[in-house]
Every structure is written in C-alpha cells, then in structure tokens.
Amino acid sequence: AETPTAMAIGEGGTLYTACGDSREAAGVTVTAYDATLAAVGTKTVAERVLSLHTEKNRVLILTENTLLLGDAALTEVSDREESGIQQMAPWQNGYYCVTEEGLTHRRL
C-alpha cells in the first residue's frame, strides 16, 4: 500500500488519506474510510494535496492551487475557488488560513 502524504480523522471515526503523486497521470487519490477501515468514498485530484481537515460532516482538501470542500463520503466535492492558501485550520463553520496577505478568517 502507498504511504499517505496527508491524513485526517473526522466525526464518527471517518479516516481520510491522500495517496499518490500529482506528477503522475493517476494523480492523488483522497480516500474516506469508515471505523472498520473499509473504503467508503474516493476523490482524485490532479494537484499535490497539502493537507486534509475535517469540520463536522465535511472534509477540506487543501491542494497547491485551491481548496476543495466535500461531504463525509466524498460523493459531492466542490471547488471553493480560493487560491493562495498556504496553511489552514477549520473552526466553527469556518477556517483560519495563512495567505500571502497574512492570517485571515473565512466562512464555509
């Protein structure tokens, strides 16, 4: 099995991992696992995944170029179209992030 480049755990024990290399055609696969480690959903992205975070029943996927927001099983993933985020930390239906402008707070 591939070594994950990012991991996060959400409510109810859902585990998220990012595996793969964005330089390869297959890209990076983010997988959601239930508490028994059975895969319950996947999302493939073409960019390097910088970090994974959970907030309530959602997962935030920070890539080199954007922020993706998905449901717990990764069946619905949308692009927040926010670039320039270097680091982030979710908190109470929003998140703090570090950008070129400094530390900011944004709502989900």
PLM feature spans:
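C-terminal structural cap/anchor segments
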Residues: G13-R48
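Residue position within the beta-strands of beta-propeller blades
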Residues: Y16-A18, I61, C97
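Blade-level signature of beta-propeller repeat domains, shared across WD40, Kelch, NHL, RCC1
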Residues: V77, E81-L108
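Short loop/turn segments that connect beta-strands within the blades of beta-propeller domains
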Residues: E11, A26, E55-K56, T63-N65, ...
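A short beta-strand motif characteristic of beta-propeller blades
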Residues: A1, L37-T44, L74-E81
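Structural motif
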Residues: E24-T31, T66-D71, G102-L108
